[in-house]
């Protein structure tokens, strides 16, 4: 991706409108996970060091175009100040006279957090008037919100019509890592696709079948493939309207010389709970009133072996219902295999896979954890992301 980044422009004394992703989970006004704030720190620190006037914009939650008290960015600005070790000001508006006055009072290296951009109905409609208001605050637009890059909103894309537009360091790294995986991967290249539904991963599987050497299938979506092979799957998740597509994907893999791995055994249960009784059965032996909830031990070994012998692995979606202890072993085993693999570059595609490696304490062993669930999925599907397309070319 040959897009300009903050390293390619002069920032000293410039007012920089930097779109970050501070959409953090909150409980009773407290931030429960600050990963996204920490992920933006290198960009913010770089802007500060370069003597820019740093104006940060983000959304939080889904206020649907109106001010919602508990979705104000005030606690986020306070925590950011602690992490940066400096005074961070907070505006109660995202544009207009109040924001303009606060920007006018800024010195080089100052940091100001604007109010939640989704308090304004024009944000999600990519309204040109709102984009102009944002642009009026600054000299340069920096997009560092990879997590929102698949959205064509006023603060992620529209503003780029009115200002020079470059990526932040986080956005730059995401584009570099994901771009290299798709255009020039080290081989063997393995994709692990899990999660509940085939329909959410159709574009991903189709696009990756042209790129990968190995495709590993797990999670709830695997049972549609199992049924497509003619096996009974009991009460397991299945999308009957996707069975023909599953057959087509398996055929395509064969034609393209892609090794297609599916579960050979599964963990089954009669009840969905933390204390559930489970059994392990072969993939062709699921009883009628039981459901598959995780990949079995033989499958884990096979998958771990493929991972160990890969140079690049992209993982999108868990292998089972990892939120519940009895059904978490498959997802944990894939994470462990990635953590232990030597010389394997691991890319975790945001969302549930990222949550899983966090939960199992393996995050620091992964090469790259994407900060965008939906954005990384769309990027890996080969789609153009509005928040990236709008940036200036090198």
Curated annotation (Swiss-Prot):
Residues binding substrate, per UniProt: 21-23, 36, 59-62, 118, 151
Annotated TM spans: none
Modified residues (Phosphoserine): 183
A Gene Ontology cellular-component term: cytosol
Reaction equations catalysed: (2R)-3-phosphoglycerate + ATP = (2R)-3-phospho-glyceroyl phosphate + ADP
Biological process annotations from GO: gluconeogenesis; glycolytic process
Main subcellular location of this protein, as a coarse class: cytoplasm
GO molecular function annotation: ADP binding; ATP binding; phosphoglycerate kinase activity
Binding site for ATP: 201, 292, 323, 350-353
EC number: 2.7.2.3
Subcellular location: Cytoplasm
Residue ranges that the Swiss-Prot or TrEMBL entry lists as coiled coil: none
Cytoplasm is among the record's keywords: yes
Binding partners and assembly: Monomer.
Similarity comment text for this entry: Belongs to the phosphoglycerate kinase family.
Protein name as catalogued: Phosphoglycerate kinase
